[in-house]
């Protein structure tokens, strides 16, 4: 990725006051929405340079290399920006589960029939992902 392409991308993006933009991760071959996270210029550069998705952790205030702890990494297939430049869509190849709860994706709760229902089972217990428990 050339500096000119990065500069053009950053010129089109509208980062918030903290220098962040929301990024939706979607499984490239099935269309499954996996998660929402945040990216800054540094995480975008690293993701595009290496092909492995890197986010910005708002709680840790540091780069978050998805899967460093759990092994559940995301390989970038394509990065897209929306019409307003205020959100990214990352088409990824998810290795394992995307959610820290051990579910395939982070959208495992739904309002159905007037109740909040869990619609996806845990695939990998959190203690296996993170060695806690």
UniProtKB/Swiss-Prot annotation:
Q: Which residues are listed for Zn(2+) binding in this entry?
A: 83, 99, 106
**Coiled coil (residue ranges):** none
Name of the protein = Phosphoribosyl-AMP cyclohydrolase
Q: Name one GO biological process term.
A: L-histidine biosynthetic process
Q: Which organism is it from?
A: Rhodospirillum centenum (strain ATCC 51521 / SW)
**GO: which molecular function terms?**
magnesium ion binding; phosphoribosyl-AMP cyclohydrolase activity; zinc ion binding
Gene label = hisI
Give the transmembrane ranges.
none
Principal place of residence: cytoplasm
**What span is annotated as the signal peptide, if there is one?**
none
Subunit relationships: Homodimer.
């Amino acid at each position: 990725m050339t500096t000119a392409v990065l500069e053009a991308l950053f010129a089109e993006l509208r980062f918030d006051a903290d220098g962040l933009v929301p990024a939706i991760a979607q499984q490239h071959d099935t269309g499954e929405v996996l998660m929402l996270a945040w990216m800054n210029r540094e995480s975008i550069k690293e993701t595009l340079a290496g092909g492995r998705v890197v986010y910005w952790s708002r709680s840790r205030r540091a780069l978050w290399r998805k899967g460093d702890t759990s092994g559940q990494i995301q390989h970038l297939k394509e990065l897209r920006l929306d019409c307003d430049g205020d959100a990214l869509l990352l088409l990824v190849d998810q290795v394992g589960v995307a959610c820290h709860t051990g579910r395939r994706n982070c959208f495992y709760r739904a309002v159905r029939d007037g109740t909040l229902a869990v619609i996806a089972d845990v695939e990998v217990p959190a203690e296996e992902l993170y060695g806690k428990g």
